[in-house]
Design a protein with these regions (language model features):
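Carbohydrate-recognition loop of C-type lectin domains
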Residues: 136-256
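N-terminal polar alpha-helical/low-complexity "assembly arms" that mediate subunit docking
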Residues: 1-140, 235-303
Length: 303
């Protein structure tokens, strides 16, 4: 795995600026304040009228409370749009620009191809992490994390990178591709090497080698035993497969470990009693290797 240890943004506490919005509470507060505007001797009558849904004043306060709820939600959304941990889409792109980092293109669109090739852009998670690493790029590519940051910024097809120095004045950068199984083709390696070899990035004394990650293919074959048998069995099986696919298709990493306990955790969705993996061997990838799931084969277990 690479040596850069970013703050786990998902573990940050919920920001206080984001408030929980309750329409009924807003409406009750609106009614209470409206009642207080009448003379004390008339407030009981007004309160009784506001308890009636057909009362025009009630409708007016309901509309007003709804508008306030919408406004508060807009304030919430504007607040999180300015937080690196929570921003998405173009809001995140504008935040990343503060670090001189932009979203990269993984694959250019080609509508004339058969079938048409869609445009693929860097994911929010990848862009967010590169923004966190931006300070590493202030140095030339001598330090390990600086090499990693610049390698990941060289091209949108770079999903992950590691950097090691097996001998003095020698740097080996390993690249994992965002396309296919993660193997980096020679063309991508040439782009990364040219980018890293820029006089403003690579120290003069470094001998640079850029290589592709070694891909470790693995399959998941499992028997899924359910709490109860019934018509929902296929739905539970599909939910387990979807859950495991979420893990298998997460942002690609070099040195990722795929352990039996992790697979069990993702397959144990609601309704699953027991999981039995067939022929499983834990995968512990080195910093030069990347696991890639080629098959998920789930079947209902019978006892």
């Amino acid at each position: 795995m690479n040596s850069f240890t970013a703050i786990d943004l998902s573990q940050l506490p919920a920001p206080q600026v984001v408030e929980q919005i309750d329409y009924e509470q807003i409406l009750a507060e609106r009614k209470a304040y409206a009642i207080s505007l009448w003379p004390a001797e008339e407030q009981a009558e007004i309160a009784g009228r506001l308890d009636m849904e057909s009362e025009p004043l009630t409708k007016l306060l309901e509309e007003n409370a709804y508008r306030e709820m919408v406004w508060r939600q807009r304030v919430n959304e504007a607040s999180v749009a300015n937080m690196l941990a929570l921003a998405k889409g173009t809001d995140l792109e504008n935040l990343a620009a503060n670090y001189n980092v932009k979203r990269l293109t993984i694959q250019k669109a080609n509508p004339s191809a058969v079938p048409p090739i869609p445009k693929l852009m860097e994911s929010d998670d990848s862009l967010r992490e590169r923004a966190q690493m931006a300070w590493e790029g202030l140095s030339t590519a001598g330090p390990r994390n600086s090499y990693i940051f610049h390698a990941r910024s060289a091209d949108g097809q770079v999903a992950d990178a590691t950097a090691e120095s097996p001998f003095p004045a020698e740097a080996v950068v390993t690249v994992q591709s965002a396309l296919g199984d993660g193997y980096a083709p020679p063309a991508l390696l040439a782009i990364v090497k040219a980018y890293l070899s820029d006089d403003d990035r690579r120290p003069v004394g470094d001998r640079l080698t850029v290589q592709s990650a070694e891909i470790i293919n693995y399959q998941v074959k499992a028997k899924i035993f359910l709490l109860t048998a019934g018509p929902e069995s296929e739905l539970i099986l599909k939910a387990a497969e979807t859950s495991l696919l979420k893990f298998a298709h997460q942002r690609r990493r070099l040195g990722l470990e795929v352990s039996e306990s992790v697979v069990h955790a993702y397959l144990h969705v609601e309704g699953v009693r027991k999981v039995v993996l067939e022929g499983w061997v834990d995968i512990v990838a080195t910093k030069y290797q990347a696991p890639y799931c080629t098959l998920i084969d789930l079947a209902l277990g019978v006892e």
